[in-house]
């Protein structure tokens, strides 16, 4: 079993819940993909990093991250996987709002000004979270070269309409829901 297949099995085993769920978009779903159960799992997180690095291998970027909280463990997994390959990248966290104390930053981590960055999300239904991060990154002077997610729940066209490449490791139908 390769990394992509092993990660998919892990998502199916640990990341899919059934019931009535309200998504961050306000929409309702009978199944919920809770990828924090995957991206924060000690066995599966390294797979997340390796699989996303492979999926985005045709893009050139030197930092990854997105809107807190879904993107945070994804960025950390990619940071560690890249370092293990000998090709380090930086990670950053985009806050939902600028801090009102301390350094009053919206984007935490290494400065993204003038850097080629990849915006991340664990799963995306409408694209709102990742596009909020994209807007903050552009406002900070970053060059956003694309968006990558583990599971696409329907955000692809909205991201593409913004002129950004969109990489999804899995489509919803691959999860069997």
Model segments located where?
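Short, well-ordered alpha-helices that flank and scaffold nucleotide-derived cofactor binding pockets
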Residues: 50, 54, 76, 80-84, ...
